[in-house]
Swiss-Prot record:
Gene3D superfamilies linked: 1.25.40.570
Record has Phosphoprotein as a keyword: no
Tissue specificity field: Ubiquitous with highest expression in flowers.
Record flagged with keyword Acetylation: yes
Domain of life where this protein originates: Eukaryota
Keywords, sorted A to Z: Acetylation, Proteasome
Pfam assignment, any one: PSD13_N
UniProt name for this protein: 26S proteasome non-ATPase regulatory subunit 13 homolog B
Function per UniProt: Acts as a regulatory subunit of the 26S proteasome which is involved in the ATP-dependent degradation of ubiquitinated proteins.
Protein encoded by which gene: RPN9B
Recorded family membership: Belongs to the proteasome subunit S11 family.
Quaternary structure (record): Component of the 19S regulatory particle (RP/PA700) lid subcomplex of the 26S proteasome. The 26S proteasome is composed of a core protease (CP), known as the 20S proteasome, capped at one or both ends by the 19S regulatory particle (RP/PA700). The RP/PA700 complex is composed of at least 17 different subunits in two subcomplexes, the base and the lid, which form the portions proximal and distal to the 20S proteolytic core, respectively.
Domain PCI: 174-347
GO biological process, one term: protein catabolic process
Amino acid sequence: MAALQYLESQKNAHPELGEWYNSLADLYQKKLWHQLTLKLEQFIALSVFQAGDALIQLYNNFITDFETRINLLKLAHFAVVVSRQYPEKEAAVSYLEGVIEKLKATKESRINEPISYIETQIALFKLEQGDQKECKKILDDGKSLLDSMTDIDPSVYANFFWVSSQYHKVRQEFSEFYKNALLYLAYTSVDSLSESFKLDLAFDLSLSALLGENIYNFGELLAHPILKSLLGTNVEWLYHILQAFNHGDLVQYQELCRVHNASLSAQPALVENEKKLLEKINILCLIEIIFSRPAEDRTIPLSVIAERTKLSIEDVEHLLMKSLSVHLIEGILDQVNGTVYVSWAQPRVLGIPQIKSLRDQLDSWVDKVHTTLLSVEAETPDLVAA
């Protein structure tokens, strides 16, 4: 059989992989397709297959012999890995389109998952070719397909959100990149990612959080383990800037900008959006002021906000109107008396320092309740006894 002959020839050419080829041949002859699939997953992860056309040859000479007998989503996984070894994107797309046709020919009931997985990879190749329009079309069609399906494998979602994030990254649509990249991580084990990949993604996520419109809550990102990839690197400063934003700490932010001026200047997007960043941290400083005040003290003098943000009263009013317009807070701005009454603030993911502050407020409230109780007991003993 041609498949076995191929394995034998490869074993002779690469004796160091002899045990691998023997195992593949044994499972193939016994038609243990599930076990063969698992062994292939391990095999193609070996370093010898990470360059050249070795994977393409393995697919064409071995996997094609039984490709529709294995789990079709696993076949899609293999096909996508193989496609990345084609030096020309057009050849890779043509190969993947051929696999899709084979999937359709099986007439299996669950072919939408593997087809969606492969089409998403085609969208990425189109994006890498500079064809944003075709990439967007494939992604839109893919979303409609996913929305119509149930019980979807996490790898299909992960692949879709990853390619979507890359589309928005190319277009510098920071908020959309941020949303899709976090969704990608929701369906992906961080431990399965390489250190270099984690560092690059953590860096991109951090920048998009800072630059994205209407992103004012950094707690979710700071709590994600991928952000630890920034620590101990030459971009650790970005992690500390995120913390400063999360705490609304204008003083710390300005100090970090001074210390890491060279690194910040090397990021064109940060330089171009310097004013927006300052406005955002001032808004977050305002939010921090609101959350740090007792629940019964919802009226805040504009002078208090001006002192913390180092802004004029006029600029504070503008800051409040911006916060009201993006629905970070609800309330009434009283320009005559120079106050703002805040009736509601957008919920947020709290960090440890913010939780500690909340605990301190709760402790203070408990003390007040206890004092009130003692006062009532002392003044109306008969009523309490009754």
